[in-house]
Design a protein with these regions (language model features):
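N-terminal acidic leader/helix
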Residues: 2-30
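Generic hydrophobic segment detector
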Residues: 11, 32, 71-75
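N-terminal, charged low-complexity regulatory/assembly segments
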Residues: 13-17, 45, 67
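Amphipathic, hydrophobic secondary-structure cores in small proteins
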Residues: 21-24, 28-53
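Long, compositionally biased
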Residues: 50-75
Length: 75
């Protein structure tokens, strides 16, 4: 088995969050990517990986919603 670098783990986590959010909100990949980039969610997930990756996915998705709500990204 090949060990993943820390950087690869973070990237995989962010991708997992994008895919999970897409499925949970019934959005397109392009829509989630645009939303996350516009409001800085992608950067937030990357920078807060150490804390977020220890949480369950439902908690992470709820955290993303709170993050977006504070920044005006949720209608």
């Amino acid at each position: 088995m090949i060990a993943m670098s820390e950087e690869a783990k973070v990237i995989a986590f962010v991708a997992f969050c994008v895919e999970s959010y897409k499925a949970a909100k019934n959005l397109s990949g392009e829509g989630v990517s645009s939303l996350f980039t516009r409001f800085g969610v992608d950067r937030y997930l990357y920078e807060e990986y150490e804390v977020l990756h220890t949480m369950g996915i439902d908690a992470v998705l709820a955290d993303i919603d709170r993050f977006l709500e504070v920044r005006g990204g949720l209608a």
